[in-house]
């Protein structure tokens, strides 16, 4: 993940990844590389919190992160200061091992004063994903196991067609692992700017041909739990 192309949101990893081969939608989509650990927090000052982490990378170094970043919820927040810190790893093994190396609830007084931990969770990418954080639309979706592989296939198709149509977009589908009652499938549509995200929406409302693929994909979704825009960035890269 040095040149990270993850190809970076509940129970055991084996039980959650296996549905991709089930159902009557033949052919498994190759899962993406690596894994992510996300720490969901409520920050009194998100910008100050992010700067503090940039200036003090020791926690990232301690857990062996390959890359780390922050996402701040910009629209549809559940609470003021909603954001999360993510850490990218080369494998699920490394991601799981990181949980033994750092306890976010035992942080320094300086960190504890600026943010309140909500929960943490691991994610496995279910398709290739180019990690280029910026303007990100995040949907939390409930999708039955029998439809998950078909949904991922549609996202692979949609991403390809949208890029052919001139959009600089990365689409990711992520399986939560160990997220308790909080998490569902994460669908991310990432653009280099909010203006580009808006251009995609203009084309969608204008009847772009690729909207038929989107319609087929959303027909496989049981429930849209939430829909937000986030501003994401890389704040640490291992040397």
Give the label of every model feature segment.
Residues 20-239:
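Short S/T/G/P-rich N-terminal loop/turn motif that feeds into the first structured element of a domain
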Residues 7-17:
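Bacterial N-terminal signal peptides
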Residues 1-4:
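Positively charged n-region of N-terminal signal peptides that target proteins for export
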């Amino acid at each position: 993940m040095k040149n990270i192309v993850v190809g970076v949101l509940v129970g055991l990893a084996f039980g959650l990844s296996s549905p991709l081969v089930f159902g009557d939608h033949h052919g498994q989509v190759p899962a993406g590389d690596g894994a992510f650990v996300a720490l969901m927090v409520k920050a009194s000052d998100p910008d100050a919190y992010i700067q503090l982490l940039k200036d003090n990378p020791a926690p990232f170094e301690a857990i062996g992160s390959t890359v780390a970043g922050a996402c701040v919820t910009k629209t549809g927040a559940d609470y003021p200061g909603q954001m999360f810190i993510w850490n990218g790893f080369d494998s699920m093994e490394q991601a799981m091992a990181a949980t033994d190396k750092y306890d976010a609830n035992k942080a320094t007084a300086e960190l504890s004063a600026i943010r309140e931990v909500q929960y943490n969770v691991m994610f496995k990418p279910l398709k290739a994903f180019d990690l280029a954080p910026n303007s990100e639309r995040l949907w939390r979706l409930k999708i039955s196991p029998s439809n998950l592989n078909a949904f991922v296939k549609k996202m692979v198709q949609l991403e390809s067609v949208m890029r052919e149509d001139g959009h600089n977009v990365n689409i990711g589908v992520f399986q939560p692992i160990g997220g308790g009652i909080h998490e569902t499938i994460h669908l991310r549509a990432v653009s280099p700017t909010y203006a580009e995200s808006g251009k995609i929406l203009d084309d969608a409302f204008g009847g772009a041909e690729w909207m038929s693929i989107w319609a087929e994909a959303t027909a496989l979704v049981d429930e849209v739990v939430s829909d937000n825009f986030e501003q994401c960035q890389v704040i640490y890269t291992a040397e």
